[in-house]
């Protein structure tokens, strides 16, 4: 059965301690795919804190450091005495080996990066159903030179003698590869072995269980008080609206603030969809001129986000006085939102876990300090794919469930530089063409996001024997599972040609279309 804390919140069955790996959150996703709840915590979480959570298992993530470096991040050594199964991944394995008396050194041969066939020495326990020769993803420059007392080898590769190790009696396991990445062909089999057979977890992290628990937590938190929801029409806020409607009924008021940065036709679609089709009343607020005037002369992307976030709350506060009183503001904040805004990195000079801000998230980074609402964020522990499952279970139609993600600040952060009405109209028309053609090609649901970006430069062109000097549009299409990482989508040439021709011929002020082929990382999906 699932465990709950005294405040009704579900306790994690698997805790991932993060040592700065880019894959830490991916480990959490993979564990959740086995229907077992997992969370990511800082590597400095103490053994006593972990004992209080009563997890069934602990995973030590990879990381960019070397365990023998002066300021290497270290876990509480008392963790090894908790009696809880531990799986160390890459850096996590090396840390386990070193702290328990083994030796880790820089690889004497070649460092191992990329795919490598795994040769299984002991096909039982952790490596049950992991076939010999399976491809595993390697990313390490250090290796284990001597195992601690009581440890045995489970598998090796051509360049890594100790690719998987274990102390079977103490249920301590380590793998030098990354089972969580898609390139590791039997990675999920290994994760299931650890979660189910070694830790004894039960598959109780299901969509229906989450809904029941979230409804109970919201009811407990809110009581008889009223909640105001910022509805955008995307899958996150729409799922949140359906969930809150189920939990608190008419205590929920949905408000759609038209800030003027939506895609073409979306405000009208949103009002018709919720108000008429699903009988969820939505208060429509036309604040277009208010927002555009606040952004006059603003070019810095962080400043734009902060201004939009602050203005959103100001409008909410004003409208809540008219419609309220309201005590709570509901937000569709997701787990990746929190992760991306907070950062999960390790300072190489101090070994401390620090926040490295990429860009502030519109939900968690733009709130004013004098916020008059308490926050309700029942989706903040979910990944995007989990939100879609919840939406479907609540009866949200596929046209909403499978909509491409759209940022809270809208087109304002897809226009680089100053935002003007002219640029907004231009980008709306171009963006509509992109979405129309991708739908027509039957590729809309194969792509994570597809949109247009307007650049703050002009280029020379020739149209009708006349010189033009107009804006370029960037075509940005990416494939992803959860938005944490992404690759650029390989669209057919004919489709890209059609999109380019239509934009140049139909959108006034544009004479060039370029393609963004940057993955995340090193880039981000959005340009601002």
UniProtKB/Swiss-Prot annotation:
Enzyme class: ligase
Keywords: ATP-binding, Glutamine amidotransferase, GMP biosynthesis, Ligase, Nucleotide-binding, Purine biosynthesis
CC per GO annotation: cytosol
Record-annotated Glutamine amidotransferase type-1 domain positions: 13-204
GO function terms (MF aspect): ATP binding; GMP synthase activity
Alphabetical list of InterPro entries matching this protein: Class_I_gatase-like, GATASE, GMP_synth_C, GMP_synth_GATase, GMP_synthase, GMPS_ATP_PPase_dom, Rossmann-like_a/b/a_fold
Residues in GMPS ATP-PPase domain copies: 205-403
Annotated residues for binding of ATP: 232-238
The reaction(s) this protein catalyses: XMP + L-glutamine + ATP + H2O = GMP + L-glutamate + AMP + diphosphate + 2 H(+)
Pathway(s) it belongs to: Purine metabolism; GMP biosynthesis; GMP from XMP (L-Gln route): step 1/1
EC number: 6.3.5.2
Gene3D superfamilies per UniProt: 3.30.300.10, 3.40.50.880, HUPs
Residue positions of the active site: 90 (nucleophile), 178, 180
Role summary: Catalyzes the synthesis of GMP from XMP.
Subunit structure: Homodimer.
Protein name: GMP synthase [glutamine-hydrolyzing]
Organism from which the protein derives: Parasynechococcus marenigrum (strain WH8102)
Lineage of the organism: Bacteria, Bacillati, Cyanobacteriota, Cyanophyceae, Synechococcales
């Amino acid at each position: 059965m699932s465990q709950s804390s005294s405040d009704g919140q579900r306790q994690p069955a698997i805790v991932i301690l993060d040592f700065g790996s880019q894959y830490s959150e991916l480990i959490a996703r993979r564990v959740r795919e086995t229907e077992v709840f997992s969370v990511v915590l800082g590597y400095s979480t103490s053994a006593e804190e972990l004992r209080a959570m009563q997890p069934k298992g602990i995973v030590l993530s990879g990381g960019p450091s070397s365990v023998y470096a002066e300021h290497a991040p270290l876990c509480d050594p008392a963790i090894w005495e908790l009696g809880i199964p531990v799986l160390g991944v890459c850096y996590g394995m090396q840390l386990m080996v070193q702290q328990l008396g083994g030796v880790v050194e820089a690889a004497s041969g070649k460092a191992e990066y990329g795919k490598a066939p795994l040769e299984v020495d002991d096909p039982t326990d952790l490596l049950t159903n992991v076939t010999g020769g399976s491809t595993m993803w390697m990313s390490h420059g250090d290796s284990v030179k001597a195992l601690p007392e009581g440890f045995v080898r489970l598998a090796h590769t051509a360049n890594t003698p100790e690719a998987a190790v274990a102390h079977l009696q103490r249920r301590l396991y380590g793998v030098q590869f990354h089972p969580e990445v898609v390139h590791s062909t039997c990675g999920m089999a290994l994760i299931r072995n650890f979660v189910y057979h070694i830790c004894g977890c039960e598959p109780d992290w299901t969509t229906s269980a989450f809904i029941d628990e979230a409804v109970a937590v919201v009811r407990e938190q809110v009581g008889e008080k009223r909640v105001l929801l910022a509805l955008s029409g995307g899958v996150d806020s729409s799922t949140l609206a359906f969930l809150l409607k189920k939990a608190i009924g008419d205590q929920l008021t949905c408000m759609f603030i038209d800030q003027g940065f939506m895609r073409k036709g979306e405000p009208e679609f949103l009002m018709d969809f919720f108000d008429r089709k699903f009988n969820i009343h939505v208060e429509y607020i036309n604040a277009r001129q208010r927002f555009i005037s606040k952004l006059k002369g603003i070019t810095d992307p962080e400043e734009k986000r902060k201004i939009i976030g602050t203005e959103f709350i100001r409008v909410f506060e004003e409208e809540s006085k008219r419609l309220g009183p309201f005590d709570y503001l509901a937000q569709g904040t997701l787990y990746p939102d929190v992760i991306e805004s907070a950062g999960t990195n390790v300072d190489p000079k101090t070994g401390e876990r620090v926040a490295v801000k990429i860009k502030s998230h519109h939900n968690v980074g733009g709130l004013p300090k004098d916020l008059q609402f308490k926050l309700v964020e029942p989706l903040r522990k979910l990944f995007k794919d989990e939100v879609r499952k919840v939406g479907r279970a609540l009866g949200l139609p596929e046209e909403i469930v499978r909509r491409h993600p759209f940022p809270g600040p809208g087109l304002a952060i897809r226009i680089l530089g100053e935002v003007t009405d002219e640029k907004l109209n231009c980008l709306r028309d171009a963006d509509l063409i992109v979405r129309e053609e991708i739908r027509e090609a039957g590729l809309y649901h194969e792509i994570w996001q597809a949109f247009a970006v307007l650049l703050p430069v002009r280029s020379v062109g020739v149209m009708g024997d006349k010189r033009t000097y107009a804006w370029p549009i960037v075509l940005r299409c990416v494939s992803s599972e959860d938005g944490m990482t992404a690759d650029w989508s390989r669209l057919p040439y004919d489709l890209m040609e059609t999109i380019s021709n239509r934009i140049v011929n139909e959108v006034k002020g544009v004479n060039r279309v370029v393609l963004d082929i940057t993955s995340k990382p090193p880039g981000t999906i959005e340009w601002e």
